[in-house]
């Protein structure tokens, strides 16, 4: 494989790599007849991104040498990102970029031709790999939003950098709402600040979604996508369904196509505070192998099996984690077998997902009979024998 990129397209390629670096730690490079594909996926398989650069994007493009099969490789994202670390320098000094991949060499060669005849050559180690492909279909999503990326990029500027997730929904008057999502804690006494941005439907080229629908997804990957789309001055299309189904972001142009697929949080309860205030969720990009055991399964005398079954129930019903995280392991300490205080023994109405310890108390309290300790000392059934007599 050999391709040559010139002019401003070098910066476009660098911007794409920066967007991909916000998702995964590995870059999958695959030359195709339709163009050069750059893909990545995060470690939890809850976010996937793909850029396909058409042959017209390059001044020269050769997917494979005559008589040779198409090659594909996997590279460390940090290594490839180092080539385009400073986009300002790339824009000012780099005139063209040549990327070559050969089966007879053990390196991916990226050569930057700079001003004044300076050449920078990067030999990047790679591994052979299978093709990375996510299964998704934007046409299957009933809801669609299409707007210039600048509109959404300006909207997310109001959110703090430390914010993990954002909720996108349709409010009253068909206004698009972006709201910061904070997972509620059972023992939280102070409410965190909530930021909400409202955008009128006149700023959208297409808006096909009913009022009240809302999905929550990770903001970090969304920022990276908006950064690329805004710099390329391209519109962004959002395909989404009900909470729990992935949201698909697409960018289409004659020179490139981009697809970002992000997992959304699943609603466990009905929303009562509007379309953009979802209740606790759990990610569903991966099929869960565990299922909620029947109550009869808890009557086993084997305490290990009992704990495993209970832990599975707590993981399925009490998960309220982010798309890229999972429920922390359940502690098997002996003091968790029964409530240790009056607050734990009495069930209370708590908004949000109760912590795992609360679930342990409720599950055991519903299966095991409560143990009441007598108020006074235990009665003496037999007195101590007199050792001297």
From Swiss-Prot:
Query: Where is the region Possesses 3'-5' exonuclease activity?
Result: 51-91
Q: In which tissues is it expressed?
A: Expressed in heart, brain, spleen, lung, liver, skeletal muscle, kidney and testis.
> Per the record's keyword annotation, is Nucleotide-binding included, yes or no?
no
Primary location class: nucleus
Instruction: Name the reaction it catalyses.
Output: Exonucleolytic cleavage in the 3'- to 5'-direction to yield nucleoside 5'-phosphates
| GO-annotated molecular function | double-stranded DNA 3'-5' DNA exonuclease activity; histone deacetylase binding; protein kinase binding; SH3 domain binding
Q: What Gene3D superfamilies does the database record attribute to this sequence?
A: 3.70.10.10
Q: What class of enzyme is it?
A: hydrolase
Coiled coil (UniProt feature): none
Which residues does this entry mark as bearing Phosphotyrosine? 28
User: Known post-translational modifications?
Assistant: Constitutively phosphorylated on serine and threonine amino acids in absence of DNA damage. Hyperphosphorylated by PRKCD and ABL1 upon DNA damage. Its phosphorylation by PRKCD may be required for the formation of the 9-1-1 complex. Phosphorylated at Ser-341 and Ser-385 by CK2, promoting interaction with TOPBP1.
Q: What is its EC number?
A: 3.1.11.2
Q: Name one Pfam family in it.
A: Rad9
Query: Is Membrane one of the keywords?
Result: no
Q: Where in the cell is it found?
A: Nucleus
For this protein, the record's InterPro entries field holds: DNA_clamp_sf, Rad9, Rad9/Ddc1
Assembly information from the UniProt record = Component of the toroidal 9-1-1 (RAD9-RAD1-HUS1) complex, composed of RAD9A, RAD1 and HUS1. The 9-1-1 complex associates with LIG1, POLB, FEN1, RAD17, HDAC1, RPA1 and RPA2. The 9-1-1 complex associates with the RAD17-RFC complex. RAD9A interacts with BCL2L1, FEN1, RAD9B, ABL1, RPA1, ATAD5 and RPA2. Interacts with DNAJC7. Interacts with DNAJC7. Interacts (when phosphorylated) with TOPBP1.
The family assignment reads:
Belongs to the rad9 family.
Please describe what this protein does.
Answer: Component of the 9-1-1 cell-cycle checkpoint response complex that plays a major role in DNA repair. The 9-1-1 complex is recruited to DNA lesion upon damage by the RAD17-replication factor C (RFC) clamp loader complex. Acts then as a sliding clamp platform on DNA for several proteins involved in long-patch base excision repair (LP-BER).
Q: What is this protein called?
A: Cell cycle checkpoint control protein RAD9A
Organism per entry = Mus musculus
Whichever gene encodes this chain, its name is: Rad9a
